[in-house]
From Swiss-Prot:
Residues 171-211 are annotated as: Disordered. This is Protein ATAF2. It holds the Pfam family NAM. The lineage of its organism: Eukaryota, Viridiplantae, Streptophyta, Embryophyta, Tracheophyta. Involved in disease resistance response. May function as repressor of pathogenesis-related proteins. May function in the regulation of host basal defense responses against viral infection. Transcriptional activator involved in responses to wounding and infection with tobamovirus (TMV). Binds to the DNA sequences 5'-AAAATATCT-3' and 5'AGATTTTT-3' of CYP734A1/BAS1 and CYP72C1/SOB7 promoters, respectively. Acts as a suppressor of the brassinosteroid (BR)-inactivating enzymes CYP734A1/BAS1 and CYP72C1/SOB7, and prevents their expression in almost all tissues. Gene3D superfamilies: NAC domain. GO terms for biological process: embryo development ending in seed dormancy; leaf senescence; negative regulation of DNA-templated transcription; positive regulation of DNA-templated transcription; regulation of cell size; regulation of photomorphogenesis; response to fungus; response to jasmonic acid.
């Protein structure tokens, strides 16, 4: 950001509390020009503190911002400390800035992630500077129609020097385990075939291998063509043609065991004696 601001080489911005109030905050509230425009103007209370460094104009371990002072009530003096997914909480006593005359007030705040009053304390710190002894009934800036204490100057830093991020527990995405998915009462799978597993001692780790349902269907398909041919031949050898069965003078059923047609399907049953009964009309 230094190149964009055209800052001189070796420039460092480490102002004291009094310098921040006298040369920056007072001039901002009075709409006067600031010699080194290195402080960004944002609505600080709309963001989490770890999002602010990217919005700053300058800074490495601490960042400075002008922010409108958001109040809980339009005509009141109590500020609204809600910010981002958490809130800022004041800590310690206010510190007067300026001697012999007090120009501003410094307040220290700590960011808590989550909803008040059960938020999680973080390492993000804010020093908020506001003007002191402001007559709220008559102190209206004619150029921007803001009260003189409507602007605050904020210094943001992490006391551990890290970019820690915190999120409320109820906003963390829930991870569904494999066990929960398998126990779901609704099966959203497109496949309607059951998965078959067989033990395979040769596989590594002793895991079974999956048999495809398509393979099972081909292997279990009966040979209907061969079976029909065998039944037709068996029927013809036992009873002959349909014309022979219609002869009125003689009916000679022959029960012959035909084993040749069933050898490819099952083991033949025990052989029984050959039966040949002939019935002739009595004279």
């Amino acid at each position: 950001m230094k190149s964009e601001l055209n800052l001189p080489a070796g420039f460092r911005f480490h102002p004291t509390d009094e310098e921040l109030v006298k040369f920056y905050l007072c001039r901002k509230c009075a709409s006067e020009q600031i010699s080194a425009p290195v402080i960004a103007e944002i609505d600080l209370y709309k963001f989490n503190p770890w999002e602010l460094p990217e919005m700053s104009l300058y800074g490495e371990k601490e960042w400075y911002f002008f922010s409108p002072r958001d109040r809980k009530y339009p005509n009141g003096s109590r500020p609204n400390r809600a910010a981002g997914t958490g809130y800022w909480k004041a800590t310690g006593a206010d510190k007067p800035i300026g001697k012999p005359k007090t120009l501003g007030i410094k307040k220290a705040l700590v960011f808590y992630a989550g909803k008040a009053p059960k938020g999680i304390k973080t390492n993000w710190i804010m020093h908020e500077y506001r003007l002191a002894n402001v007559d709220r009934s008559a102190s209206v800036n004619k150029k921007n129609n803001l009260r003189l204490d409507d602007w605050v100057l904020c210094r943001i830093y992490n006391k551990k020097g890290t970019m820690e991020k915190y999120f409320p527990a109820d906003e963390k995405p829930r991870t569904t385990t494999m066990a929960e998915q398998s126990s779901s009462p609704f099966d959203t799978s497109d496949s309607t075939y059951p998965t078959l597993q067989e033990d395979d001692s040769s596989s590594s780790g002793g895991h079974g291998h999956v048999v495809s349902p398509d393979v099972l269907e081909v292997q279990s398909e009966p040979k209907w063509g061969e079976l029909e041919d065998a039944l037709e031949a068996f029927d013809t050898s036992m009873f002959g043609s349909s014309m022979e069965l219609l002869q009125p003078d003689a009916f000679v059923p022959q029960f012959l065991y035909q084993s040749d047609y069933f050898t490819s399907f099952q083991d033949p049953p025990e052989q029984k004696p050959f039966l040949n009964w002939s019935f002739a009309p009595q004279g």
